[in-house]
C-alpha cells in the first residue's frame, strides 16, 4: 500500500513561538527523519505582522522538500499576495489544489483557511459579507474535493472541520473556532491536517479518517505523520 511521510506544524504566530519553531526544526533535521513534504497549516505570523516573514524564511531555508501551506486567520486576506511574494519557498494554497509526484506516488493536496459556523464578532464587524464568504468557500471545497484525482489525498485546513478537534477549548465558542458543516468533507481525504485550537485535541478520527491538530503551542513539536490510503466500505473488512 502506497504511503508517504510528512512533517507538519502550524500556529507559529511569529514572533510568539518563533524560537520554539526554530529549535524544533533544528532538532528534527539533526535526527535525519525522512519526510517528503513539509506542511504548515496556517498562522505563521501574529496579527498580520509581515516583518516576521524574513525570519521565517531564514529558518525554513534548510528544508529541502516541498513546503506547502494554507493561510490562517492571522494572515489577513488582503495581504495574501504580499505574503506569497515575501515567502517564495512556500507554496500557499488558498481554496486551491496542488498535485505533487513523489516517489511515483501522486499526492493531491487541497489547502484552505476553512470556515466558521458562526463568524466571530470581529469578523462580523470588519469583514462585510463574511457569512456568505464562508458558505461559498464550503461549496468550493466540496467541489475541489470531488474533482481531486490522486493516489493519496490530503486536506490542509486552518480552522478545524469538526468540533471534536476543539474539545478542550471553551465549548461556548466552538462555532466561532471551526465548522461541523465540513465534517462530510473529511471523507474525501486520506488525511486531514488542521490547527487553530491551541487547547484542542491532538488527534481525532472521523469515520476512520485521521484529523491531526498540528498547532505548535499544543504539541510543542513538529509532527511526523504517515499518510496512507484509507480503506473504505467493505474494503476495511478484508
Protein language model regions, located:
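Active-site neighborhood of phospho(di)ester-bond hydrolases with catalytic His/Asp-centered motifs
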Residues: 8-10, 38-43, 67-73, 91-95, ...
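Conserved catalytic scaffold of divalent metal-dependent phosphoesterases
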Residues: 12-14, 78-172, 215-216
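Basic, amphipathic N-terminal segments that precede the first structured/catalytic domain
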Residues: 10, 53-60, 66-89, 98-100, ...
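Binuclear metal-dependent phosphoesterase catalytic core
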Residues: 2-3, 98-103, 132, 183-188, ...
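Charged helix-capping and loop-helix junction motifs
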Residues: 22-24, 51-59, 86, 90, ...
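Active-site environment of divalent metal-dependent phosphoester hydrolases
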Residues: 13-19, 45-50, 73-81, 97-101, ...
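Short, electropositive alpha-helical surface patch
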Residues: 57-64, 164-180, 206-218
Amino acid at each position: 500500500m502506497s504511503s508517504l511521510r510528512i512533517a507538519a506544524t502550524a500556529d507559529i504566530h511569529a514572533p510568539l513561538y518563533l524560537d520554539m519553531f526554530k529549535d524544533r526544526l533544528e532538532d528534527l533535521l539533526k535526527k535525519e527523519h525522512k519526510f517528503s513534504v513539509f506542511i504548515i497549516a496556517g498562522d505563521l505570523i501574529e496579527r498580520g505582522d509581515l516583518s516576521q516573514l524574513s525570519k521565517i524564511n531564514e529558518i525554513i531555508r534548510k528544508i529541502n522538500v516541498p513546503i506547502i501551506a494554507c493561510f490562517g486567520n492571522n494572515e489577513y486576506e488582503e495581504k495574501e499576495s504580499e505574503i506569497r511574494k515575501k515567502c517564495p519557498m512556500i507554496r500557499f494554497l488558498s481554496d486551491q489544489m496542488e498535485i505533487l509526484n513523489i516517489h511515483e506516488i501522486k499526492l493531491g493536496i487541497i489547502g484552505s483557511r476553512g470556515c466558521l459556523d458562526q463568524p466571530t464578532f470581529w469578523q462580523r464587524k470588519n469583514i462585510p459579507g463574511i457569512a456568505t464568504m464562508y458558505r461559498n468557500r464550503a461549496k468550493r471545497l466540496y467541489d475541489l474535493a470531488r474533482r481531486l484525482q490522486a493516489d493519496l489525498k490530503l486536506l490542509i485546513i486552518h480552522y478545524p472541520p469538526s468540533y471534536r478537534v476543539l474539545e478542550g477549548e471553551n465549548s461556548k465558542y466552538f462555532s466561532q473556532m471551526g465548522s461541523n458543516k465540513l465534517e462530510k468533507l473529511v471523507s474525501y481525504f486520506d488525511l486531514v491536517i488542521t490547527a487553530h485550537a491551541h487547547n484542542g485535541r491532538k488527534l481525532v478520527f472521523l469515520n476512520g479518517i485521521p484529523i491531526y491538530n498540528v498547532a505548535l503551542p499544543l504539541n510543542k513539536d513538529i509532527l511526523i505523520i504517515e499518510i496512507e490510503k484509507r480503506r473504505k466500505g467493505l474494503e476495511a473488512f478484508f
